[in-house]
Amino acid sequence: MQQPYEYRYPQGTGPSAPPPPPKAGVIVDPKYCSLHPVDLAIVRKVLKITDGNFVITNAEGNLLFKVKDPFFSLHEKRILMDGFGTKVLTLKGKIMTMHDRWLVFRGGSTEEVDLLYTVKRSNMVQITTKLDVFLADNIEQKKCDYRLEGVWLETSCFVYAGDSDIILAQMREKKTMQSVLFGKDNFCLTVNPNVDYAFIASLIVILVEIQISLRKLTKQLLLE
């Protein structure tokens, strides 16, 4: 009688097994991780009147985050605040770098000790926007920890874990007559379970800011 195979290691493990796919988990705060999918609505006020040009709500319409754009700043800087006005993240952009690099810090800090992750375009020349995300402890930045990829015409994008095909979140742009008339960009964002939605929301804000800077640069080049 043929004996069943015996495995020295459980299947899928051992010295020659491929590394497991990376997981998202907590990046900003455990309270921003849910056991269930989270649907968010992101509205960018193109013709902004107040200092909050992004508003992020949940499916029930409750305010979760808003983005403050300081008027007097030497750098591209955005502050992600919760519904109570507490600073959650500070997004500091280096737009003039070749890959449009953004540094994201905890709270209202811009100190190196509070750096959580870095976001930059994967290539200088792109047909669609692709962003690489490196956590603060990824010093060499040879492989990204997360990545964001837009699709044709940038009407939607996906956030992936590392170089894998594991989707952590999906964003799509929602065009309405009201949004066009009142100068607003509307985005629908679905964040998968156990994924930090404050982290994902910050990536979408950075994506939009990079797209805006690229459009301005393209317009300037065409006028020259």
UniProtKB/Swiss-Prot annotation:
It holds the Pfam family LOR. Residues 1-23 are annotated as: Disordered. Might be related to the phospholipid scramblase and tubby-like superfamily of membrane tethered transcription factors. Belongs to the LOR family. This is Protein LURP-one-related 1.
